[in-house]
């Protein structure tokens, strides 16, 4: 019988009351159960992978493991399977609205790069059943693993009623609800970065950070990476939750590792069940920029290693200079877009070219979006990008 970790470590996983803002109210007992599930590898087929394996709390809820494609995509429970997209951080995911279409007809919100999960609860359950992730065969198998541990039976029945783990549908739904509750705690969304401290008047930007902030709000960054077109929203998430096609090339190393083949096309939003409009092909959700300086590689397929490269990529749309057409990581021209139609040119072409000084400043500002507990990772990230 698979033995699951005891419930004692929960005290170190759940912040003490009042230590951080919560993204939304979460019942302490439910969140505590979710915290235990989050670190439990028994919820994967071979009992080798937990949620925390790919969303390491010590690494801003991203995957620190290297596979055949480096850090670009994650390795599955079997130690061989690879995904085709970069593992997104779960930080601030609870702030993402449910998937919907706004008054202007734009798709917004939802979880994952393609919004295939309506909300955090749906997101929490899907990796367990994904064959290239945790690879559990079905909900009944998940329920059986939960029943293997008496502590889980006690905890689930206290919250969801007697016999909950005997019903696969109820058990799976309850586990997803608990995981979502944990992800809605302040551990994931503390709003304690230097940026937040500056906004609260507790600290000041350096001159370079201040310049970077000015670049950010006056260039076209704000069009997609701020909730409002003007001004700063309280608890800013640095995303408008929309879907855009910015013309990224295929990450050929990741595509090969995934085994999907050279002819595969990642259609993004168009692949979401219920979306049939070809105009949505190639669109991916705008990610939050919180902790961006410590959560590389970048873009939905992890195609860029360096944050500077991710910024410089946008110059290809705003400058005719020869250097703007070259990927500094490869020394070769930027690859062709995987999906060349439906490019968000109105946003991409609205800015001006960023020179080296402005890129330096923008990187400095983006580093201020790092949660306090991840600030030590900044030096590590800077050193890695110099290698």
UniProtKB/Swiss-Prot annotation:
The record's annotation in InterPro entries points to: Cyt_c-like_dom, Cyt_c-like_dom_sf, Cytochrome_c_Peroxidase/MauG, Di-haem_cyt_c_peroxidsae, MauG/Cytc_peroxidase
| UniProt-listed PROSITE patterns | CYTC (PS51007)
Q: Where in the cell is it found?
A: Periplasm
Please list the disulfide bridges: none
Pfam families named among the record's database cross-references: CCP_MauG
PTM comment: the record says: Binds 2 heme c groups covalently per subunit.
Q: Specify which residues bind heme c 1 according to the UniProt entry for this protein.
A: 51, 54-55, 300
Mention any one GO cellular component term assigned to this protein in its UniProt record.
periplasmic space
* Binding-site positions, heme c 2: 221, 224-225
Quote the function comment for this protein: Involved in methylamine metabolism. Essential for the maturation of the beta subunit of MADH, presumably via a step in the biosynthesis of tryptophan tryptophylquinone (TTQ), the cofactor of MADH.
What protein is this chain from? Methylamine utilization protein MauG
Q: In which pathway does this enzyme or protein participate?
A: One-carbon metabolism; methylamine degradation
User: Highest taxon of the source?
Assistant: Bacteria
The UniProt record lists the keyword Signal: yes
Recorded E.C. number(s)?
A: 1.-.-.-
